[in-house]
């Protein structure tokens, strides 16, 4: 186990930069590291190669440009049982804790707590770009997109990630999607919990240009669209482009909006099966 604290760089990676190599972190701590100007990765930059991150904590790291804790570009690997707390992206491109591009890692049993982006971009915890990452059994609490969208996770048409059995609690966004904002990609969720998330449009989830939405065994409890009387969709806001939305074996309770659509703002045909 190793400790990396209070390091800084003007370009990539306040603490660790790995280029086309293999890197393994086990029981490590990376805190208060900073990438000061362009490029990003407050604590780490992983460019190509292979990585394994297990039982490691990333706390209060900061990047001016993308990926408050880690910028992953073209690297393959996994993160397990690790904590990301209070990491920030402050100026551009998003991803308060992680920005993942051209890479498809697995994220298992990780915790993302109070990470944020104040950039005019997206993803208080994670921004995904050209990836089919899988995120499973992980917890997202109190992550924020302070000026734009996706309090927890953002992805667009270049990505097709998978999500199962995660918890999203008390995440928030100034604009779209307290937990998720999906721009142009399909959205498939299985067994996820959304509790007390809030935004202007879509307290839990918002989509734009998404064709297919599928939620199975999802619980949506107490999410809110609460910015103003023009807010809409306490839980899920579907904007243009949806051709199919299916909700199966799911529970919607206690969601509300200061404006319209307490639970669901539809677009296109919708199908509900065994929901309450």
Label every PLM stretch briefly.
Residues 1-8, 22-34, 50-62, 76-88, ...:
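Right-handed parallel beta-helix
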